[in-house]
Amino acid sequence: MKWSEISIHTTAEATEAVSSLLYELGANGVVIEDPEVLYREWDTPFGEIYQLSPDDFPAEGVFVKAYLPVDSSELLDVVEELKEQLAQLIEYGLDIGKASIAVNDVHEDEWAHAWKKYYKPVHVSDRMTIKPVWEEYVPKHPDEIIIEMDPGMAFGTGTHPTTILCLRALEKYMAKGDQVYDVGTGTAILSIAAIKLGAKDVLAMDLDEVAVRSAQANTELNGVHEHINVRQNNLLDGIEEQVEVVVANILAEVIVRFTDDVFRVLKPGGTFISSGIIAAREADVKAALVASGLEIVETIFIDDWVAIVAKKR
């Protein structure tokens, strides 16, 4: 069976937004080729990236490649719709770079397995490791938390700096027995980590149906589905019960729109962990958090990505 590969030359900042667009248009898989992962100096020995070749990456910017089971007649419509959606991202103030689009035909066996070479076990901290389901991994110690991911339908592998920042913040700030809201859950990796770190239960929410299905599959894969309620929902709309922790790894443009709702659903003393924030938007997010009554307690960085931890006093 032949598939169509759509490649978009974009920026690191727009990677997740562009990936989401491609899934909405019917992509069965996405590969992100970012040269930064070759040269990144991580702030700890963790988060290692393995077995990557410079020949697989662009000289500048990022390639986001999607694979769709469409023929040439349907592909024209998909590309036109993609152009319209990319234009909307620009209207939202997101820098999408060149946003050039290239199309190629590929055989199913070329994409179904080749992308897996990019995804190996990643040590997020001395307690937590993310591994793909097809990789063998021996825990380094009995208390190590292993999160298994199958990113076949997902919006990420869990190794993006923003995800790692959120995981480390959860490990530091979430207490055993806490209840958690995971807004824009994607693969549900943060929800899974929260349960394995001792959360009582998690409500994982995403507006995208594909993300909801992916999240449900990953919670079952990790044996935590009985403690995680995955729901299709727009941010915190309609959510009333207060919890100890809210986590959101989404775009800064989205975070600033619902900080009032975060304050509303947090218990006094509760924690909001937000990421998906490029450094240039740090001040905007902090201003929105403070305006909503939240107190900034920590800012964490990996390269140009930021996670902000705030509390409701």
From Swiss-Prot:
Gene3D superfamilies: Vaccinia Virus protein VP39 (3.40.50.150)
Coiled-coil stretches noted in the UniProt entry, renumbered to this chain: none
Keyword rRNA-binding: no
A Pfam family assignment: PrmA
Residues that hold S-adenosyl-L-methionine according to the record: T163, G184, D206, N249
Record's catalysed reaction(s): L-lysyl-[protein] + 3 S-adenosyl-L-methionine = N(6),N(6),N(6)-trimethyl-L-lysyl-[protein] + 3 S-adenosyl-L-homocysteine + 3 H(+)
Subcellular location, record wording: Cytoplasm
Protein name, UniProt field: Ribosomal protein L11 methyltransferase
Species whose genome carries this gene: Brevibacillus brevis (strain 47 / JCM 6285 / NBRC 100599)
Species lineage: Bacteria, Bacillati, Bacillota, Bacilli, Bacillales
Name of the gene encoding the protein in the UniProt record: prmA
